């Protein structure tokens, strides 16, 4: 029997009898003495045994390979090369679904990932490589792996699919990410640096550059921190796939890399101070436009900011919320902005605190915290009732303290008897009745009219909005599942006519949670041509669609925010093409027939018949509205249709069951008027009749107002442009006057013209100078945090305007320069906290990406969210890569940059061992009869196992198997869990080179 055969038999028996790592080490040592074998043949025998077994994942196999590496039988580079030879990463698309059951190979990716991660650990601890030659060999092996994964991506990429290529397989994503981390770790070792810095390995660097060029574009979708790390590596060593000119000063490059490591290690962190301005800015950012409130992200940020200091957390978030209200009053913010600020304080914070108390089981002296927070407020902004009669100024916030305290008492944070003591006078109201979500759901199910009563209370300041919204959204989800569209229509109508209620909804729910079931219902709407009455169906469809459109346009939501994941979605097609007319020859036979039927019904027959609607589903009708308008208006403009007939026909669209379609009609009409080179009199008359109808029913009037709210802003811009081209026209102003009350519908964080003019004409450098001036005033205010004084004027719209108009690449350097000056002036810790908060503050453009880091979507079911702009965090990461160069010219700036980078990472660090608390769920299911609820009363989504089909028994068995495997390898599996960030791993890899004491070896759980 030959050596490979003997070894193959040995490996087969070891796997069959589940021989642990220690015994395997001893047995393999004995066999090696009797039957020597080359390392390549040894690995071939082991991996061929795996192929023959056809087992998708065997935890012993990586342990055996690791054992062979530790005992010096095989080299790491040879392991990686042999692993690739037998990997199923080479499988073609038609074989990918079989995962080795029918093909020549078994599915190997889970084993591949584990072996590569073991290699990463070995590299990070300094165990590998020992020589430059081994480092070169590992680099070449990584290069081959990267090309193999890139090839897999190309062969599985389908431009028509949201999730294709590597994103179509979680295992390939994990393999891809592990390779990048391994490359970064190897490049940070002493031997890795020597290889990359030497001029004798140009061939390797050319190939490495080619591999990075293939890797980095794909990395954007997987991990931005990893992409930034490898991009910095590419720039430092000029790894672009081309040979470096001979004149390059390589020794200087080598010194720069060593200096980079030494400089960053030499930067000492100062004291961490949580400035008063920090949370003031953060809450302003959450609420200044579309409410960007995610409980998981907020808890994580607060936990990172305050650690276990719950008293400070409660006191400072309360103080900041009152400060935001005070600032809004002094800045004369709009009533809708003041309403959002107020609702966050009164409706959000009390149940948020109650849920936090219930979930942490920590005793917090709430009355003391509230008392301290109230003592720090400006008494002129929040006067008592006795003071308000003496004051001549604005007393709009005089009852806010009382509302908040009663909401706290309703949630059992404080006893009702404490309210008078905290107010310093007798309260002017009584304790409101506390609501429970489940009870409200039962009430609505028993009496659907109860839903509208509750929706009316969403805007009340009694601390009950969270329970109401939880109940309403749950009922809506149930109605969508049951297709009970009549009751759902009434709820949607009640919500869509109350824009401020939509704002409160987003304080407690993200848009996808509310809208995804509605969009799914609209997409799958069942249409039966024999169902009887059709007008009620159009009515129900239109009401549901109108609520989706109201959310979409009020908050400028993208399809991903609505929960739309399919390119075939009706809602997506309507949003993209609903206001675009089609040429007749582009319509299919059914569309032509439907168009003819609707034209006949509107302009020839005496009304819209059941026959017309039965032949055309609501989905088909909405997609034809723009074409219907186009053809009808063209007929009128060419004299084929009288204007009065045209006007009378279009007035049918003012009926409630068709009114939502007017959104797309008005949008098309505005575009048509704006594009016209001829006299626009006829379309302007039509527009006036639809915007300001002579008669409209009471029911339709509410829907019409919502329609105008949605369409008004775009129409106004188009009409003003037309008026500029035709200054003598008198038929435009009446339309603009009718649109005027609807222009403030959007809530997207955009700046007012007067604000922008003030900032951009700032005497000290325009918009950037005004941002720096605001920064200075916030730092100055924070130097005396206990003083009862009004906060400095601030709106996060200023920073948003800077990022949107100038770009983050210009805003961040200005912030860093100001931070540097404040550091020189002795205000470094305060300024550092403020700058870090500005960078961490949520933005609408990046919010879904940030949410995905806390609650990842399944890439197999929906597309991963994307960020459309370069953020302050992105620029900070890129600037951090240039610290070595900056330190040579401006050491203080480099130090400030390093500290800022660390502080931002600390504030945004993902939770490691803290469960992901679904605070909304806790809030809704808590009994308001007492704070001391047990854990059994709360539904905590601690692990998300249920969402992935893993039951408690399965999870326990998996953990036991991993623990056993780890114990066999002599490792501790208590690990940090799967929440460890890539930066943590990369930083550990950097620090561990020659410094094993910096590396946490308890990493088993990561893999």
From Swiss-Prot:
Assigned GO CC terms: mediator complex
Entry keywords, A to Z: Activator, Nucleus, Transcription, Transcription regulation
List the GO biological process terms.
Answer: regulation of transcription by RNA polymerase II
Give the primary localization class: nucleus
Name the domain of life this protein comes from. Eukaryota
**Compartment(s) of residence:** Nucleus
Q: How does it assemble?
A: Component of the Mediator complex.
For this chain, the family text in UniProt reads: Belongs to the Mediator complex subunit 5 family.
Q: What is this protein called?
A: Mediator of RNA polymerase II transcription subunit 5
